[in-house]
């Protein structure tokens, strides 16, 4: 279910403060975060976030197309190993 329009988008305050602090400086460092629930704002464009996926931090470079999505959408939590191989050829 989507968030109510009257509430507006959500992003953690500590994340906004870190982006504002880096916007003033020329050198942009990777912002490490555990906040997968935060919505990507237009201010975040051009910044790199290290989003935690449960075991490591995945680097996510924010582009214009990502605005409005959540940070967690770009750091998958599950690794797909592939389906079992079909052994019909080797049985003959």
From Swiss-Prot:
Q: Domain of life, per the record? A: Bacteria
- The annotated region (Disordered) lies at 1-27
Organism ancestry: Bacteria, Bacillati, Bacillota, Bacilli, Bacillales
Question: Which Gene Ontology terms cover its molecular function?
Answer: rRNA binding; structural constituent of ribosome
Q: Which organism is it from?
A: Staphylococcus saprophyticus subsp. saprophyticus (strain ATCC 15305 / DSM 20229 / NCIMB 8711 / NCTC 7292 / S-41)
Gene that this polypeptide is encoded by: rpsS
Annotated Basic and acidic residues bias: 9-27
In the UniProt record, which is one GO cellular component term? small ribosomal subunit
Q: What does this protein do?
A: Protein S19 forms a complex with S13 that binds strongly to the 16S ribosomal RNA.
Q: This protein is called what?
A: Small ribosomal subunit protein uS19
A family per Pfam? Ribosomal_S19
The UniProt entry's sequence similarity note says: Belongs to the universal ribosomal protein uS19 family.
Keywords, A to Z, come to:
Ribonucleoprotein, Ribosomal protein, RNA-binding, rRNA-binding
Which Gene3D superfamilies does the annotation name?
30s Ribosomal Protein S19, Chain A (3.30.860.10)
List the InterPro entries hit by this protein, alphabetically.
Ribosomal_uS19, Ribosomal_uS19_bac-type, Ribosomal_uS19_CS, Ribosomal_uS19_SF
According to its UniProt entry, the protein's GO biological process terms are:
ribosomal small subunit assembly; translation
């Amino acid at each position: 279910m989507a968030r109510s329009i009257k509430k507006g988008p959500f992003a953690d305050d500590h994340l906004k403060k870190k982006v504002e602090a880096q916007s003033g400086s020329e050198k942009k460092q990777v912002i490490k975060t555990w906040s997968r629930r935060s919505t990507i704002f237009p201010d975040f464009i051009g910044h790199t976030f290290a989003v935690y996926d449960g075991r490591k931090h995945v680097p996510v470079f924010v582009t214009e197309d990502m605005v409005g999505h959540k940070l967690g959408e770009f750091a998958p939590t599950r690794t797909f190993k592939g389906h079992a191989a079909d052994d019909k050829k080797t049985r003959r």
